[in-house]
UniProtKB/Swiss-Prot annotation:
Domain of life per record: Viruses
Transmembrane segments: none
Signal sequence region: none
Residue ranges that the Swiss-Prot or TrEMBL entry lists as coiled coil: none
Organism: Sheeppox virus (strain KS-1) (SPPV)
Annotated Pfam families: Pox_T4_C, Pox_T4_N
UniProt protein name: T4 protein
Length: 240
């Protein structure tokens, strides 16, 4: 191959690379770069009971949210006090799917269209999710996992009642709209074999089975004493 041929080859390669790079830069708008979503996925394998398809209900409070249905409750809240929050707990959507005749439940708790991720107060970036079973009336036997995203100063803590839950695999995704379109990034998975497959359903297929949880109404009579601390965090009650 002559020197001229090599020169032409590398020139074409440079032009192509520059062109592709330029296209990549222009693909995302400023709005897409500054609009974020957070998604927490929980694959819950039940122990000694089957999660019946009783429906799923979401109850939102100023400091968090809770879900009811399928034999357990999930309490999600941040670390903000009544004085620190503006009634804007960042997770606001709950979807669920029941697999394998109730042996597995996949829960997705998420939010989208966040434009203030970096300016959120520190307390709002500390998010706790606790899985508590309806059939357990005493203090939880807890297993705790945590994951952090240092670039965004976000931390997630997941607590599971292992007296009625055999296993939980979890994923947390934090990404902006640009990353969602073009890059598989911002995802952290922890749990069994670093997978979030649930029963025979792969992670990418959950979207085909998820149903949106209905809006429910809070009834304090449904909650045991060991769950009251979560309720106080979610609704900013000093006592129950």
């Amino acid at each position: 191959m002559s020197s001229l041929t090599l020169f032409i080859f590398f020139l074409q390669l440079f032009i192509f690379t520059s062109s592709v790079s330029g296209i990549s830069i222009k693909r995302c708008t400023e709005e897409e770069n500054n609009t974020w979503e957070i998604e927490v996925g929980l694959c819950i394998q039940t122990e000694n009971f089957r999660a019946i398809k009783t429906g799923c209900y979401k109850i939102q409070g100023p400091g968090g949210l809770l879900t009811e249905g399928n034999g357990f409750k999930i309490f999600a809240h941040d670390d903000c006090s009544k004085e620190e929050t503006q009634n804007n707990f960042i997770l606001d959507s709950v979807n669920k799917a029941v697999y394998a005749l109730g042996k597995y439940v996949y829960m997705e708790i998420s939010t989208s269209n966040i434009t203030t991720l970096y300016s959120l107060p520190q307390c709002a970036k500390r998010i706790s999710l606790s899985i508590s079973c309806d059939q357990v009336t005493t203090e939880m036997k807890s297993y705790v996992e945590s994951v952090s995203f240092k670039d965004y100063d976000l931390e997630f803590v997941i607590t599971t009642d292992i007296s009625c839950v055999k296993h939980v695999s979890s994923s947390v995704i934090v990404r902006n709209e640009c990353e969602k379109k073009y890059i598989s990034t911002g995802k952290k998975i922890f749990g069994f074999n670093n997978k979030i497959d649930c029963s025979a359903v792969k992670f990418s297929e959950h979207v085909n089975y998820l149903k949106t949880c209905s809006v429910g109404k809070f009834d304090r009579k449904k909650y045991y004493e060991h769950q009251h601390n979560y309720i106080k965090k979610i609704f900013h009650h000093n006592e129950l």
